Amino acid sequence: MMKRTLLIASALLLLGSSRVSAESKIVNNGNGTATVICSQGLLGPEKWDKQVKPIDKKGYITIFDGKSLGGWRGYGKNHIPSKWEVTPDGCLSFKGKEAAKDEEGGDLIFAHKFKNFELTLQWKVDKGSNSGILYLAQEVIKPDGSKVEPIYISAPEYQVLDNQNHPDAKLGKDHNRQSASLYDMIPAKPQNSKPYGEWNEAKIRVQNGTVSHYQNGVLVVQYKLWTPEWTKMLQASKFSEAKWPVAFYLLDNCGGANHEGYIGLQDHGDRVWYRNIKVKEL
């Protein structure tokens, strides 16, 4: 037990504890905008950026408006990886196999930590494509101090998938790797995704540990973090303590000490588009 604990502790060099205090609550400026404090990078000196974003009367902040990537950066990076682009029609897209060989990939995060929130967006995939929406993500440094662990070992994932043509749709258990599922743990029911090339509506709500996934206006997944049931689900997944102890520890303590984290979009190597990304603090 001690050896295992030390192994995990050496891997979990979280750059979050010193940053949390600087990430103040979002300020509604009263003029249709809100000020959001975002971290500019993971490694090196802490730097902060004040982003002014549109906010509507219901409290939804537009964190991607089809034009600007202000507040976004690569996971574990201080810049936007070049395989991500804003398309002429106002989408945030990962180029996938259409990217040049020398272009940089990697997951993308909106660099403000959210605790209780509701996220809404639209997504579509190319034929056979795979991606994901991650939440409560942490940036976890590997023991050598130079790289980060994969984002998905600290963050629950709302699966984004072409259910008809990607092999992952038939893997896992009871279709728990299909779109809108809590990846590898809870299948989305009913499974009401639209085919590749068509837009899907996604909503993720996190409030005091209760998490809800919606797909095309329908509640398809609901579960409770930080409970014995959550731990049991992890133990039955690819993130179990026996299979992947670091991932198990991080996900069992999802969101860290403050139960908050980043919203992320996954680079799974495939073409995907996102648009109208909005978030509301609860």
Protein language model annotation of sequence segments:
Residues M1-M2:
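N-terminal secretory signal peptides that target proteins for export/translocation
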Residues T5-L14:
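Sec-dependent N-terminal signal peptides
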Residues L15-V20:
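C-terminal segment of classical bacterial N-terminal signal peptides
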Residues A22-L282:
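Carbohydrate-interacting regions of secretory-pathway proteins
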